[in-house]
Amino acid sequence: TSQKISLQTQGKTIMISPAQEIVLISSEKSDRALFYTTRGIIESKMTLRDIESLLSPLGFFRTHKGYIVNLSMIQEIQNQDNGTLLLTLSHYPKEKVPVSRHYIKDFKNTLHLV
């Protein structure tokens, strides 16, 4: 059985299996995050730092100050001219997720990319 986490959103709690259901998490404001899931987008009042510590053991990776991705949902990795990467993920192909220079070395090591 896969581990479930609870997301507080708009007065209710949603139980979700991160590895199977969460595609990516983005945050533009420090106190809230958008969980892009296989069931739709869920907004929750959590910081990316808290989410990262919760989900990194479950196959998630911080790619940028504003993004955490489920590594198993990556479909395509594009090299950018400025030395960064751009990810395309399943379920949300229009959301192009950056891998910033700060995280790129660890990202490549994690995925065993040369």
Language-model features: where?
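Conserved binding/recognition cores within well-folded domains
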Residues: 1-96
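C-terminal output/interaction extensions
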Residues: 106-114
